[in-house]
Amino acid sequence: MSDETSNTTHFGFRTVPEGEKAGMVHGVFTRVASKYDIMNDLMSGGVHRLWKDAMMDWLAPRPGQKLLDVAGGTGDISFRFLKRAPGAEATVCDMTESMLVEGRQRADAAQMADRLDWVVGDAMALPFASNTFDVYTISFGIRNVTRVQDALNEAYRVLKPGGRLMVLEFSQLPNPMMQWAYDRYSFNVIPVMGQIVANDRDSYQYLVESIRKFPDQETFADMIRKAGFGLVKYRNLSLGIAALHSGWKI
């Protein structure tokens, strides 16, 4: 029996063979692709847009940079990056083709298609040469990866020396009472929204469970350091509902 089938990981609160998780996650995002952006607005009250703006503020894109936007889905991060960096280019890499289809349509509508590439790929085995990109971003995607450490190692590999990693992800609130209140909202409201808006309760149940399984801010920062990154820092957003993590390939 191979390691991939004998080892297990989590899919939300379920324990599944490692070899099955990627396909299960692919199924989730295939089902929610057409409603993904709408649901993000509903789930966060639009606050995810402010978090992404904060990501760009800290990232400070520069003209001519090459961005790799992993789990970039519908292109939200790439569009923001390109608007702030004339002459920059972005590659959106996602394992779910239907998410990329949504992104391409948005790029065409925004007349940005000539600055974007769209690639189907796995965050744990990126189809790019080493030392290729100036910036690597992943927004609300790394918690869905089967082996997070492998994805961080790949981020380090494809970045040029001096390149920067920036991760936006849901995190853990430091205040237990606030975490309790947020959990009540997440588990009782978001799956219902998923049923009403996307006719898919189960996918959104998985998404909220995956948030609770993701490491806290300090643990995740240590994982980034383990991949080889230096100057690792993080910033809490909305009191820790989400967090930005930054690291440099130095």
Swiss-Prot record:
Q: Which domain of life is it from?
A: Bacteria
Chain sites annotated for binding S-adenosyl-L-methionine: T74, D94, D122, A123, S139
**Which pathway does it operate in?**
Quinol/quinone metabolism; menaquinone biosynthesis; menaquinol from 1,4-dihydroxy-2-naphthoate: step 2/2; Cofactor biosynthesis; ubiquinone biosynthesis
Q: Which cysteines are joined by disulfide bonds?
A: none
Q: Name one Pfam family in it.
A: Ubie_methyltran
Q: For this entry, list what GO says about its biological process.
A: aerobic respiration; menaquinone biosynthetic process; methylation
Which principal EC class is assigned to this enzyme? Answer: transferase
Alphabetically list the UniProt keywords: Menaquinone biosynthesis, Methyltransferase, S-adenosyl-L-methionine, Transferase, Ubiquinone biosynthesis
Provide the catalytic activity annotation: a 2-demethylmenaquinol + S-adenosyl-L-methionine = a menaquinol + S-adenosyl-L-homocysteine + H(+); a 2-methoxy-6-(all-trans-polyprenyl)benzene-1,4-diol + S-adenosyl-L-methionine = a 5-methoxy-2-methyl-3-(all-trans-polyprenyl)benzene-1,4-diol + S-adenosyl-L-homocysteine + H(+)
Q: What is its EC number?
A: 2.1.1.163, 2.1.1.201
**Care to name a GO molecular-function term for this sequence?**
2-methoxy-6-polyprenyl-1,4-benzoquinol methyltransferase activity
Q: What does this protein do?
A: Methyltransferase required for the conversion of demethylmenaquinol (DMKH2) to menaquinol (MKH2) and the conversion of 2-polyprenyl-6-methoxy-1,4-benzoquinol (DDMQH2) to 2-polyprenyl-3-methyl-6-methoxy-1,4-benzoquinol (DMQH2).
NCBIfam families named in the record = MenG_MenH_UbiE, PRK00216.1-3, PRK00216.1-5
Q: Which family does it belong to?
A: Belongs to the class I-like SAM-binding methyltransferase superfamily. MenG/UbiE family.
Q: What is the protein's given name? A: Ubiquinone/menaquinone biosynthesis C-methyltransferase UbiE
Organism taxonomic ancestry = Bacteria, Pseudomonadati, Pseudomonadota, Alphaproteobacteria, Rhodobacterales
